[in-house]
């Protein structure tokens, strides 16, 4: 059994995605129905939708679109991590609207697509602190060189539950293990961060990676955060750049071979159930 904490739906007929023009491998529709067929075969029973960096004017429309899909009979979707702009004045009112929607489980603002100092702005930090006590999480999608800024932001908002996406986005293709490793160790010292074991197949060489390629990265994340502070995600359809959903699930099983069942269950579903109150 898996809870997928990181699913993206791309429906270009419904929503604008400006960044797709620079990502030709993903510049097509990736619809819920396609995902769900494969996900069920892989043992995924529940999924969280992760915002897909739509045009900012369409942030609420994305949430509404995904919520409509979730209402269909038998849907795997149990909630959404929605887009936000904490650097803008309208965030406080936006936060109140999202708090009133039980389908919304948290927020994400991708920070590796904006200048590094965006997360250091006074308004940004004030707004992140506002999330504290709401029961909503904040996903951190950052690059290894931003680890110091991540740690500083987390320290300023101790009441916020943060989720570090994609094992901190290691450059596995270039074998850049050491600089990434130090950053993970530093971030993991903050008890209000959990790490998402997701995305890594897209950062490895698509032609040559194996479970053994990924293992040192996954093992360092688990050693740093501990079994109680890790969750699993598919990062579909981005995982298709490195083999696809079924391949990533198989690699996960291979890397967890011999791991105690109680620990496996924490990573694969129990921690997510606790974190987002499914």
Where do the model's predicted regions map?
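Active-site environment of divalent metal-dependent phosphoester hydrolases
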Residues: 10-13, 54-57, 87-90, 112-115, ...
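Active-site gating/metal-coordination segments in enzymes
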Residues: 60-146, 152-154, 196-200, 207-208
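An N-terminally biased module of ancient metal coordination in phosphate/nucleic-acid-related enzymes
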Residues: 1-67, 250
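Short, electropositive alpha-helical surface patch
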Residues: 57-76, 160-164, 214-223, 245-255
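Mid-to-C-terminal alpha-helical segments outside catalytic/metal-binding sites
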Residues: 1-3, 26-46, 220, 225-231, ...
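Conserved, mostly hydrophobic/aromatic
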Residues: 6, 47, 66, 80, ...
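A generic "structured core" feature
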Residues: 1-10, 40, 112, 122-123, ...
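Catalytic pocket-lining loop regions of alpha/beta-barrel enzymes
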Residues: 118-231
């Amino acid at each position: 059994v898996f809870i997928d904490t990181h699913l993206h739906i791309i429906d270009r007929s419904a929503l604008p995605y400006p960044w797709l023009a620079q990502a030709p491998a993903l510049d097509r529709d990736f619809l819920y129905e396609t995902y769900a067929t494969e996900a069920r075969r892989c043992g995924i029973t529940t999924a969280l939708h992760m915002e897909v960096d739509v045009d900012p004017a369409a942030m609420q429309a994305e949430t509404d679109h995904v919520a409509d899909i979730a209402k269909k009979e038998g849907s795997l979707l149990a909630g959404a991590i929605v887009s936000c702009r904490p650097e803008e004045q309208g965030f406080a009112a936006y936060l109140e609207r999202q708090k009133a929607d039980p389908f919304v489980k948290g927020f994400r603002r991708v920070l590796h697509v904006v200048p590094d100092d965006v997360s250091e702005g006074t308004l940004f930090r004030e707004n992140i602190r506002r999330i504290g006590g709401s029961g909503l999480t904040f996903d951190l999608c950052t690059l290894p060189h931003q680890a110091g800024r991540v740690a500083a932001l987390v320290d300023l908002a101790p009441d916020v539950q943060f989720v570090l996406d994609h094992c901190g986005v290691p450059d596995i293709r270039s074998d850049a293990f050491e600089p990434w490793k130090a950053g993970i160790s530093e971030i993991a010292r903050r008890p209000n961060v959990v790490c998402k074991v997701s995305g890594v197949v897209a950062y490895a060489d698509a032609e040559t990676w194996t479970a053994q390629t990924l293992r040192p990265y996954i093992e360092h994340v688990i050693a740093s955060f501990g079994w109680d502070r890790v969750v699993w995600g598919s990062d579909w359809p981005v995982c298709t750049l490195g083999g696809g959903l079924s391949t990533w699930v198989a690699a996960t099983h291979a890397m967890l071979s011999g791991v105690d069942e109680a620990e496996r269950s924490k990573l694969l579903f129990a921690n997510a159930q606790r974190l987002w109150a499914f």
